A protein has these predicted regions:
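Noncatalytic, basic helical substrate-engagement surface that gates or grips nucleic-acid strands
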Residues: 2-133, 139-143
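Serine-biased, low-complexity intrinsically disordered segments, primarily in secretory-pathway proteins
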Residues: 145-162
Length: 162
């Protein structure tokens, strides 16, 4: 029996959540920003409610992709450094995911979208319906298509509408 698998690009979603909620910056009593944490889980829970997946996997980048930089030296050259207020929130997001028993996949030198692309391809070949939750507009062009047509992309934008 086929399953519905929700794959989440953790870095993309945390970034999207952070910038979408900057106008209402939330902090703990000790001064740690939590708006990306709040937004990330708001997006995730809304998607779970809408899609009712059988399995959820979240992938994170833990370093830059040397492979992509070797292919294209200007890869991510124009991007700004990740704000410290956002960087401090990644461990919190990961810890909460672990507490919910949601698998986290990350590998040094391999970006989250490449990890999820490989998982999508493998699970798609099994006939599973794959939903990739990402805010990365280039995702479709950089992700290898699975063997089946059961691949769907969702953006986080609707989670912050209203």
């Amino acid at each position: 029996m086929s399953k519905k698998i929700l794959l989440i690009d953790g870095n993309s979603m945390a970034n999207r959540a952070f910038y979408a909620t900057m106008g209402r910056m939330m902090k703990t009593p000790t001064g740690i920003s939590t708006n990306a944490v709040y937004g990330f889980f708001q997006i995730m829970f809304k998607t779970i409610e809408e899609e009712n997946p059988d399995k959820i996997i979240v992938a994170f980048d833990i370093s830059s992709s040397e492979k992509r930089t070797k292919i294209f030296s200007e890869y991510k050259a124009g991007r700004h450094k990740t704000p410290e207020d956002l960087t401090m929130q990644f461990p919190i997001i990961k810890e909460l995911l672990r507490m919910m028993n949601i698998p986290i996949v990350q590998k040094d030198g391999i970006e989250a979208d490449d990890i999820l692309g490989a998982i999508a391809k493998k699970e798609g070949k099994k006939g599973n319906k794959i939903i990739i939750l990402t805010g990365d507009r280039d995702y479709l062009s950089s992700t290898p298509a699975p063997a089946s047509s059961n691949l769907f992309f969702k953006s986080s934008a609707s989670a912050f509408a209203a």
